[in-house]
Amino acid sequence: MPPIKRQPGGWVLPGYKYLGPFNPLENGEPVNKADRAAQAHDKSYSEIIKSGKNPYLYFNKADEKFIDDLKNDWSLGGIIGSSFFKLKRAVAPALGNKERAQKRHFYFANSNKGAKKPKNNEPKPGTSKMSENEIQDQQPSGSMEERGGGGGAVGSVGGGKGSSVGISTGGWVGGSYFTDSYVITKNTRQFLVKIQNDHKYRTENIIPSNAGGKSQRCVSTPWSYFNFNQYSSHFSPQDWQHLTNEYKRFKPRKMHVKIYNLQIKQILSNGADTTYNNDLTAGVHIFCDGEHAYPNATHPWDEDVMPELPYETWYLFQYGYIPVIHELAEMEDANAVEKAIALQIPFFMLENSDHEVLRTGESTEFTFDFDCEWINNERAYIPPGLMFNPKVPTRRAQYIRQHGNTASSNTRIQPYAKPTSWMTGPGLLSAQRVGPAGSDTASWMVVVNPDGAAVNSGMAGVGSGFDPPSGSLRPTDLEYKIQWYQTPAGTNSDGNIISNPPLSMLRDQALYRGNQTTYNLCSDVWMFPNQIWDRYPITRENPIWCKKPRSDKNTIIDPFDGTLAMDHPPGTIFIKMAKIPVPSNNNADSYLNIYCTGQVSCEIVWEVERYATKNWRPERRHTALGLGIGGEENVNPTYHVDKNGKYIQPTTWDMCYPIKTNINKVL
């Protein structure tokens, strides 16, 4: 507490009566503005002392008012007094003023920040602790920030963020936030990576017994990787229902991946006993191929994606790539062309890139930007050819040639049958799958057959089947419908899902040609002017992106399965166990047997647009009433678990909640 008995004149600055501590409350008229502010300050201190608090040890409202009173006073006393209490504000705790304490907290927090970055009001991934209202407030400005490429990655090299053993480097994040302009999905999985290929690169020839000459060459590597390329990895069934019922279009904008809480363990075998010990010095190699310098790994429809269920362990797949068409590099009969191709086979070693080596308890992060099209969720309720008023007569006439003779006539076209300038989209339907059951040959195939090469296995050996090439045409056979399995290979529970028509009038089109007496179907429709169509409708089970090949030329890019083709999709994040050699008598290639587990979180910002309609009538929406019943006792609904913990997968296309089936659009 301050002294009860003050000094007669106080400890004031020379020439002042109140500018200083312990002076009397009544010491005559103040000499100037600074002295007058000091007198008011002393009276406020006296009131605080009477309330039982010590104003000298805490920054308080009287100090704040004194600083404000002297903000435009440039006298010597004013400068000294103001500077003193500004210093007190910076270092002393606040007295009974939570707002001031919070500002002081932010003052020190901001002082530890790095360099300023350009402002951008777009919500960022990593908003785990934000409320939905706070995310709603983060609306974008008129122009989005400049992005250098569509799928770059930002991550430190040479040492990740970390902490000591026993201290977490991040918490579990999950859930989604929905606003008018953005949706943020957050997911975390426990992953496990182990030693692959004995830390070696190997060339493997894949020659199935039933492939009819189809074979493949693969370079298998000691690396594994993360694949986030599927909607079901990010949206729960309810979140996907929310998205497709309320938004007319959406697309990914940013993705943030964090790999943390690493635990590296050594496997020790002693006879029948196996012990798992923490290894605090072993490491894992991690890097992101943001420039796509290595062969693509995140191929659409692969099984290696992040598990749908948050409690499932993500066992990372081994990375491998195809270096050459195997049939063209066998060098049969000393073929000169095949020898030239074989001599050009590339060999990619991922250790040829800078990367981090992390230990137990450390973490790393990567951020990606997307540059892609919108996924449109609206269905056309009429085709473009019916965009007219059928009650109004037309000035158009048509020429009619009579069958069997040279007579002809002109007649006015009826108001309800006006012609259109808009044609169906392109597609190919004049083929069927080739080969016996289990064949790997598709209905359409693209081959590479260099002049002079010896191809003995047939075109299947140098060809690649491609997705059902129906374009926007109505599939005539099952060969032209996209099908997939919901269950992993080898589970003996294969049940394929067949895509159904979305009932959009800009899909499932057909082109017919008249010949005086009837119309004939044109199975193959090429690219022409004025073709109008919608992209293939996706479901929650579809991939998000596919990498557009690097080429000199291309036509319109429209993947047959509705994925987003990107020049720069998110770079693949590679990971492998560090090789720790151990001595041996004969210098054999021996090493510690270790593995790594940890958490990986993936947060994506999706740009969205809510639907708005003038349609009076209710529209169809995805509901739980369209789902099925399954499980061990056939009493559990889709997207639930049975008594054995088995997850009930959807069994039909409609259960996967496809887009372009609910919201009507005006063309």
From Swiss-Prot:
As its record notes, the protein acts as a catalyst of: a 1,2-diacyl-sn-glycero-3-phosphocholine + H2O = a 1-acyl-sn-glycero-3-phosphocholine + a fatty acid + H(+)
Question: What does the entry list under GO cellular component?
Answer: host cell cytoplasm; host cell nucleus; T=1 icosahedral viral capsid
Write out the transmembrane intervals: none
State the name under which the record lists this protein: Minor capsid protein VP1
**Notes on the domains:** The N-terminus of Isoform Minor capsid protein VP1, VP1u, contains a phospholipase A2-like region. VP1u may play a role in the disruption of host tight junctions in the airway tract. A nuclear localization signal is present in the C-terminus and can be recognized by cellular nuclear import molecules. After assembly, it is hidden because it is on the inner capsid surface.
Which keywords annotate this record? Capsid protein, Host cytoplasm, Host nucleus, Hydrolase, Lipid degradation, Lipid metabolism, T=1 icosahedral capsid protein, Virion
Residue interval(s) of motif Nuclear localization signal: 610-621
The UniProt record lists the keyword Lipid metabolism: yes
Could you tell me which residues belong to the region Phospholipase A2-like?
A: 11-66
Spans of biased composition, class Gly residues? 149-159
- Functional description taken from the UniProt entry: Capsid proteins self-assembles to form an icosahedral capsid with a T=1 symmetry, about 26 nm in diameter, and consisting of 60 copies of three size variants of the capsid proteins, VP1, and VP3, which differ by the presence of an N-terminal extension in the minor protein VP1. The capsid has a channel at the 5-fold axis and there are densities extending the 5-fold axis into the interior of the capsid. The capsid encapsulates the genomic ssDNA.
Family listed: Belongs to the parvoviridae capsid protein family.
What species does this protein belong to?
Answer: Human bocavirus 2
